[in-house]
Amino acid sequence: MEPVKMTNSSDDFTQSAEPFKLFAEWLADAAKSEPNDPNAVALATVDPDGLPNVRMVLLKDFDETGFVFYTNYESKKGQEILSAEKAAMCFHWKSLRRQVRVRGPVEKVSDAEANAYYASRPRGSRIGAWASKQSRPLESRFALEKAVAEYTAKYAIGDIPRPPYWSGFRIRPVSIEFWHDRPFRLHDRVLFTRPTPEGDWNKDRLYP
């Protein structure tokens, strides 16, 4: 296997003043080197008692306004986000020995955004959004397959509408940290912070 050409070396990424541009470059590098799902990210939320939950989701879009993923709003993660209105995520690309951490308030995506993404999903995934009562107890695999069969029959012809409880969230970051592995644990870390999602970025280099 040929080595992956990096768009930013460990030495020069610390000079960047634009976190979203830097993230785009790192994600592009990951798309070349990661064997599966370079857009996979660990998403952290907290329950009403303050106990954290973390799980993997897929980043589906990002721009200067934030990082977007989709889920069932009635799931545990959906309910925790709707309650706390804050979340954090961590990208880790082993092949590149890089990590990006994101923290910030969360908002719902627009219906237009959710409809466009939902329409792009495979038909089976759209059926699954109706059939799965995400995070709730499931009697058996058969019960899930039965629900899939029922919704497949219901929507056998024509478009499959987006369930009202299925949509997306956007994390609007107030903190983005870039980390790159270096020998002897003397890693490179750069932290971008701002007081609000509309504010200007401040940049600090951190001790490893």
UniProtKB/Swiss-Prot annotation:
GO terms for molecular function: FMN binding; pyridoxamine phosphate oxidase activity. Keywords: Flavoprotein, FMN, Oxidoreductase, Pyridoxine biosynthesis. Its cofactor is FMN. Pathway: Cofactor metabolism; pyridoxal 5'-phosphate salvage; pyridoxal 5'-phosphate from pyridoxamine 5'-phosphate: step 1/1; Cofactor metabolism; pyridoxal 5'-phosphate salvage; pyridoxal 5'-phosphate from pyridoxine 5'-phosphate: step 1/1. SUPFAM superfamilies: FMN-binding split barrel. It comes from the Bacteria. InterPro entries: Pyridox_Oxase (IPR000659), Pyridox_Oxase_CS (IPR019740), Pyridox_Oxase_N (IPR011576), Pyridoxamine_oxidase_dimer_C (IPR019576), Split_barrel_FMN-bd (IPR012349). Substrate binds at K60, Y117, R121, S125, R185, L186, H187. It catalyses: pyridoxamine 5'-phosphate + O2 + H2O = pyridoxal 5'-phosphate + H2O2 + NH4(+); pyridoxine 5'-phosphate + O2 = pyridoxal 5'-phosphate + H2O2. The keyword Flavoprotein applies. Its EC number is 1.4.3.5. HAMAP family: PdxH. Belongs to the pyridoxamine 5'-phosphate oxidase family. Homodimer. This is Pyridoxine/pyridoxamine 5'-phosphate oxidase. It comes from Brucella ovis (strain ATCC 25840 / 63/290 / NCTC 10512). The gene is pdxH.
